[in-house]
A protein has these predicted regions:
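Rossmann-like adenosine-cofactor binding region
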Residues: 262-363, 368
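Conserved active-site and cofactor/substrate-binding residues in soluble primary-metabolism enzymes
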Residues: 1, 15, 19-22, 26, ...
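Glycine-rich phosphate/diphosphate-binding loop of Rossmann-like nucleotide-binding domains
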Residues: 191-194, 199-311
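Flexible, glycine/charged-enriched surface loops at secondary-structure junctions
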Residues: 21, 37-44, 117, 154-163, ...
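Structured beta-strand/loop patches that form or line metal/cofactor-binding pockets in enzymes
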Residues: 40-71
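Adenosine-phosphate binding glycine-rich loop
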Residues: 2-23, 218, 331-445
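Glycine/serine-rich phosphate-binding loop and adjoining beta1-alpha1 elements at the start
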Residues: 94, 113-227
Length: 445
């Protein structure tokens, strides 16, 4: 496979879509040698089909603000790949949303979902609408307008959206209510729902919980115990909250969280009421972490910087894509970090990843580490289909088993001759093989 030529052709077809092209290139680097061993894949143009979404739905979303003025946003749903199940992936409401970001997320989601072993294809959607600064009534009207178009493209056996950045339980509730109103159908068409109407226990914290289960497996395989380790976390939303909660439960000490305004360093550890306060910060809608240092005087707020300059044992990006760059990676390496686990999607830049792998560090990508969120969404789908509700202990046990299985697949496909586990290659190859076999079995569709 000529990766450079393939990427040139793809970029000519999709100019300017940097996030999407970055995600494709990263996977190609991992699977090129395996692809070359299967001439039947090349004859079937498997790769050319795999990197293109099956369907992209774009639509306008008109809604009325509290002043009576009509606002118009753009809505998207990228139905990327359904080879192993109905499209599954979140909805993101944020001003930065564009087609490149959603295509990258849908592409990554395809392999992430394959790693869970659950029957879920890959998809992603959202809008350039930001809930920040909007009233509940405005958010409700936007969600209702968004679903008025989206409903005709989704269903429990077709496409099952969930939440993501800017889409929490409130937004999922408004979206589900409008879907039910339009279709007169009460089904598991969305995940991340409230418990009162079909949600699953553990779902809000599942991405963070699953990430820590995976990181613990990484450390244990390398002869380390997570207990007593210091942890840097970025972000302060559901993912960061879940990660901080589970890290503390496992005996680690979380010392940072962050927001758009900077980061908090708390040498005493972020636990107990401090973790609860993260929820208050998020609920305030201000999208800042500085008030944490006022609430807990022992902590320090560092304005305009990322937490990767802090000396820690474990670094967990939990905020957004490309939040940890090459310079940040060098800071972590110089400070002797043991392990980096992406809990955000594509949280590290290619330069950062190259540095981690060159130093033979414990590093694992988001498609493996953060798969706990979509895995628990899959468990929510199962509960909805059976009209059952499992206990928190049962869901957590299943989540733990799934993350153990993902780690095992990464080790199986990513172990190099010297014993180093390249988790990037392992995750990409394991996910790709399952999707590739399914696509070949289903013909040219």
């Amino acid at each position: 496979m000529n990766i450079e030529l393939f990427m040139q052709q793809l970029e000519a077809r999709h100019p300017g879509e940097k996030e999407y092209l970055q995600a494709v290139h990263e996977v190609l680097l991992s699977i090129a040698d395996i692809y070359d061993q299967h001439p039947e894949w090349e004859r079937a143009s498997l790769l050319e089909r795999l990197v293109e979404p099956e369907r992209i739905i774009t639509f306008r979303v008109p809604w009325v603000d509290d002043k009576g003025k009509v606002q118009v946003n753009i809505g998207y749903r990228v139905q990327f790949n359904s080879a192993i199940g109905p499209y599954k992936g979140g909805l993101r409401f944020h001003a930065s949303v564009n087609l490149s970001i959603l295509k990258f997320l849908g592409f990554e989601q395809t392999f992430k979902n394959a790693l869970t072993t659950l029957p879920m294809g890959g998809g992603k959607g959202g809008s350039d609408f930001s809930p920040r600064g909007k009233s509940d009534a405005e958010i409700m009207r936007f969600c209702q307008s968004f679903m008025t178009e989206l409903y005709r493209h989704i269903g429990p056996e077709v496409d099952v959206p969930a939440g993501d950045i800017g889409v929490g339980a409130r937004e999922i509730g408004y979206l589900f209510g409008q879907y039910k109103r339009l279709t007169r159908d009460f089904s598991g068409v969305l995940t991340g729902k409230n418990l009162e109407f079909g949600g699953s226990l553990i779902r809000p914290e599942a991405t963070g919980f699953g990430g820590l289960y995976f990181v613990r497996e990484m450390l244990e395989r390398a002869g380390h115990d997570i207990k007593g380790k210091t942890v840097a976390i970025s972000g302060f939303g559901n993912v960061a909250w879940g990660a901080a909660t589970k890290a503390t439960q496992l005996g680690a000490k979380v010392v940072t969280i962050s927001g758009p305004d900077g980061y908090i360093y708390d040498p005493d550890g972020i636990s107990g009421e401090k973790i609860d306060y993260m929820l208050e910060l998020r609920a305030s809608g201000n999208d800042i972490v500085a008030p944490y240092a006022e609430e807990f005087p022992g902590a320090q707020f560092v304005e305009g910087k990322h937490p990767w300059e802090v000396k820690v044992d474990v670094a967990l990006p939990c905020a957004t894509q490309n939040e940890l760059d090459g310079n940040d990676a060098q800071h972590l390496i110089d400070n002797g970090v043991l392990c980096v686990g992406e809990i955000s999607n594509m949280g590290c830049t290619p330069e950062a990843i190259d540095k981690f792998i060159a130093h033979k560090m414990l590093y694992a990508p988001g498609k493996a580490v953060n798969a706990g969120g979509v895995a628990t969404s899959g468990l929510e789908m199962s509960q909805n289909a059976m009209h059952l509700s499992w206990s928190a202990e049962d869901v957590d046990k299943r989540l733990h088993q799934i993350m153990h299985g993902i780690h095992r697949q990464c080790v199986e496909h990513g172990t190099e001759a010297d014993g180093y586990v390249n988790y990037v290659r392992g995750a990409n190859v394991a996910g790709f093989m399952k999707v590739a076999k399914a696509m070949m079995a289903q013909g040219v569709v």
